Amino acid sequence: MIAVKPVFKRWAPEWLIRGTIFIVILPCLLLFGLSTANPNAAAGYYGIEPADVQYSMIIFYAAVASFFALERRFFVYLATKEYFLVGIILQIVTSYICYNTHNLHTLFIFRFIQGMANCGTTSICITLIFSRIQSERAREIGYSIFYGMLLCISPISMLLTAPIVDAYDYNFLYKAIIFCYLPGAILLLSIMNTVRLNRKIPLYQVDWASFVIYALVLCLIGYVLAYGQQYYWLQDKRIVRSCGAILVLLLLHILRQLNLKRPSQNMEVFKYRNYIVGVFLIFVLYIVRGALNITNLYFATVLGMDPIHIAYIMAANIVGIVISILISSRLLILKRPMRLIWIYGFGLLLIFHTWMIFLFNTQADASTFIIPLIVQGMGAGMLMTPVIVFAVSSVPERLGGTASAVGVFFRFLGFCSSIALINFYQLYNRTNHINRFQEHITSLNPVAVEKLEMYKRGLVGKGVSTGQAAKIAQGLLGRFIETQAQLRSAIDYYTVISGLLIVVILIIALIPYINRTIINLKSKQPAPISY
């Protein structure tokens, strides 16, 4: 009998294999978070708008989400080592181009290619990890750790990149990512054998048409949600045309999938009631999770913190995520009711948002926000794995790939919707508050007069002339109005999110059939793209 050649060389110990995979997957995940690391620095370096920075991140996400279904064909065609090498080379080359370019369209194109390569590399790493985990108990822990890492990416990106951006230009981050890839890639290639994890299937009848249509749909959805508020939504022809194209292409994509013999996305998943509940909760979770950016904006614009100090405070969020990973994985192993776990998670998020409504102020000590940020991390970590594994377990095993792909679509949609909502509250709601404040700033308003006099006295006391002090005082009053508008906008947004969380908790409590889904992960593994 012929011995099967192992994936890794026999001399490589298990701790080295797992450690190497972790070293490889970390820069893959960090690559997504580069755009969120310091949006102002990115906009300043490339000479673009903040919405362009957001869209560069959305394009990356759209690439990994759309390539997910097609990626499996390349995975089974190439040997694992060869496929990994192609993915790493593509990511290094595209990172180098992003490092050198100043052209926005070039950045968009290569961020998309980068996303496709990232999907392949992450897929290999996740497959290698879960191929070595056999028991269902270990897989549940593996799920929790993997999705916990994804939740930590944003604060970790801030923590790692803030000192670099402070010392170098923004584009240096892409050079740093290249050097992060090299050690793990070299080490993994040196301990791997040239083997296949699946039977080789030739690359014939690859459904490129579905990939192109689906990628266009995702990019257009991201475009509308990222730029919609800036262009006043349907008042702008670009948004109207994009919405029309989305409807046509989405209908074409659905009809195509319904008529294909082997569709990349089987619409049959929507026949399962609990799956619909699962993807709805994923969508809500990503909107709520994105609301943390309002807190980051508050730290930066109201409290005047620099990115380094914000990153240090956000480390508390990582602590909360780690704690909740341990708790949620334990609850999954013990087969606790899924409704109970969800209520715990959404309840913690509700506590965070209502707490922050009362903490938002023009002056605050950084230590005040540590416990709330831990609570937010615990809420997000408590939900991420249980919601996703519930959705995947709600459908038969043959639909597992489609369930993951459609789940990624709803994550993408929730992510983009969160950006759109925050843009609305930052551009429209905040402007309304500024206008309302300015209506009351007149010479007849005693509060405004008193505030101006206070600024003048303070400036004159520091040696500024009376005439100059009057001009500066007007500017300080304008800044005070903007700060108050930012606070009111943040409070309004968190009030809406709190209301949404209350509704979701009530829905979960009133749906009895949720607990009928049996969580079974023995034959499944997480989707490689779940940012």
What are these regions (language model features)?
Residues 167-280:
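Hydrophobic transmembrane-helix bundles of small-molecule transporters
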Residues 94-99, 114, 188, 355-363, ...:
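MFS-fold secondary transporters
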Residues 70-209:
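Helix-loop-helix hairpins in multi-pass membrane proteins, especially solute transporters
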Residues 66-80, 165, 324-340:
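Helix-to-loop junctions at the C-terminal end of transmembrane segments
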Residues 415-513, 519-531:
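Hydrophobic transmembrane architecture of multi-pass small-molecule transporters
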Residues 42-47, 74-76, 129, 160-169, ...:
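Interfacial helix-cap and linker-helix signal at transmembrane-aqueous boundaries
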Residues 12-71, 106, 121-122, 292-296:
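Extracytoplasmic
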Residues 14-31, 35-37, 264-431:
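12-transmembrane solute porter fold
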